[in-house]
Structure formats: structure tokens, C-alpha cells
Amino acid sequence: MSKRTREESEMEAGPSTASPGVSVSPAPALTAGEVQLLKVPQKRFYRQRAHANVFIDHELDYPKRPELMDWSTHYPAYFSQPNEDGTITQGEKKVEWADVGCGFGGLLMALAPLFPEKLMLGMEIRTSVTKYVTDRIAATRQAQSLLPADSVDTKPGGYQNVSVIKANSMKHMPNFFAKGQLEKIFFLFPDPHFKNRKHKARIITPALLAEYAYVLRPGGILYTVTDVKDLHEWMAHHLHAHPLFEYIPTETLSDDPILEAARTATEEGQKVERNKGDKWVACFRRKEDPKEEDED
């Protein structure tokens, strides 16, 4: 199929709704000798609901444990493909930053060239939104690879350090990440679930904080940003109450480019700015694990 015919067919058919699963690569495979120029995706071709029910079965693919995760399809520049017997060789690099409910990937795309040595992963439960971010990363990687080495548009790392996966982070975080693996976790403009009976579906709860504390290393930072004051107070209350998190005064992070990106780089954050709305920020540091008392 010619390049033009393939592109036209994809636009007519719309984005694929297949689940990215555990081993989907942001870069689609090409036949030998074929060159396909990828288009920057347009959101209007990716229909999606504003929110998803996290308690239903979304036919998700996830590893039984972190060491079984094939990251080679997400970060081909850093991980080898599985061995012939299906076993996976763990590389030196590990995913260290996770954007939970990454939406259209604004934060990931902003941070990737600023911190090219950090592997970042967006976790998104909506199929079409995940597909959009997958296509966005693939198109951006290809565009970077085609630039001359001395181009002013060349970005450090070429976006090889960023990927996205369709996942329910409320259920499967420990399936993807080992204890203390993550350095940063972002919860940016999450679903507020206003009704009291829906509060159990909020992304920050006492039970879920235990999961996040497990995968976040001591000294790591958990970022929350929202335009809903009630949700901000809810998240801050539960984080303050958790024994493994300590509050970081926002003013101490005033010069932090990561927090600035968390506030402004996401599509939701930009919409709040256009509407001149408020943004509520709370960041917490993971404490050291308590030492076990010696038995007498």
C-alpha cells in the first residue's frame, strides 16, 4: 500500500480502538523498505468519554509482576526485545516518573526534552485517549529522527524517554512498578467525582495511598494539581493523614520547572487558564520507611 493510500485509509477509518496492552509500541512497525510519514494526531479523530468507570473490566493487559513487563516496545532505545524463549532481560534503565491519568499527554511531552535521562510513563484508562498519546509520541519521535543533527528544533533525547500505556492505576500499579521504583508520581486534574457515593472512585484514598507509597521511593515526590477546591482539600487531607507522606510547602518549589509544567502543560491546565480559573496545588514527599524495633 502506498504512503498516501495508507494515510487516507487511516483517516477514513479513524484511530484504532485496540488496547495498547503490555507490549504495544508507540512506533508502528513498517514493512521492509517502506517509509511512512506519520501525521501529528488531531483530537477530533479520537472520540472519548470525559471519564471512565474504574471499577469495571476494561480488558486490560498487565504483567503479573514488574520483572515480566516488556518495556522494549515502549522504549526501544533503552530496552532489548524479549529473548527467543520469551524471557525478558532487565536493562539498567527503569521507568521513574509516572503521570497517572495522563490525558492527552501534555505533561509528558513538556518534560521529556527537559529531562531526557528520565524514563516517563503516562497511565491512561481510556482507549482512544491512550491511542492519541501513542500516535502523538510516534509522530514526534519520527519528526525528531528526520531532523538534521544541527537543527535548532532537535530536542534532547528525541522523545525516546516517554511512553503511554492503557492501564487502571487504581488496581495495577504494583504490577508495573517494583517497590521504591518511582521517583515522581503526578495526579493532575483528576476526576473530582463530586457525589458522595462516588468518592470511593477518587484517585486519592487511604487504601490507594498505601499502593502509591509502595512504588514511590523515599524522598520521591507526589504532585497533585486540581481546579476543584473540594477535591484539593480531600487529597491534601488524606495525604497529611498518611504516615509515609510529608507536606512540601509550595513556595519551596516555586522555581521547580517540574511543578510549573504540572500546573500549565496539561490540556486541562491550559483550559483552566483560558477560563481564568483557580488551580490548587499540594505536593508531598515520601518519608523513609519506619525502622522496625528490635525484639527483646
Curated annotation (Swiss-Prot):
- Please give the biological process terms from Gene Ontology that the record holds: RNA (guanine-N7)-methylation; tRNA methylation
Q: Where in the cell is it found?
A: Nucleus
> Has keyword S-adenosyl-L-methionine?
yes
Q: Which InterPro entries has this protein been placed in? A: SAM-dependent_MTases_sf, Trm8_euk, tRNA_(Gua-N-7)_MeTrfase_Trmb
Cystine pairs: none
Provide the catalytic activity annotation.
Answer: guanosine(46) in tRNA + S-adenosyl-L-methionine = N(7)-methylguanosine(46) in tRNA + S-adenosyl-L-homocysteine
Q: Region (Disordered) spans which residues?
A: 1-26
EC number(s) per UniProt? 2.1.1.33
Kindly list the GO molecular function terms attached to this UniProt entry.
tRNA (guanine(46)-N7)-methyltransferase activity; tRNA binding
Residues that bind S-adenosyl-L-methionine:
G101, E124, I125, N168, S169, L188, T266, E267, E268
Signal sequence extent: none
What SUPFAM superfamilies does the annotation carry?
Answer: S-adenosyl-L-methionine-dependent methyltransferases
State any GO CC term.
tRNA (m7G46) methyltransferase complex
The entry sums up its family as follows: Belongs to the class I-like SAM-binding methyltransferase superfamily. TrmB family.
Q: What is this protein called?
A: tRNA (guanine-N(7)-)-methyltransferase
Give the organism the record lists: Cryptococcus neoformans var. neoformans serotype D (strain JEC21 / ATCC MYA-565) (Filobasidiella neoformans)
Q: Which gene encodes it?
A: TRM8
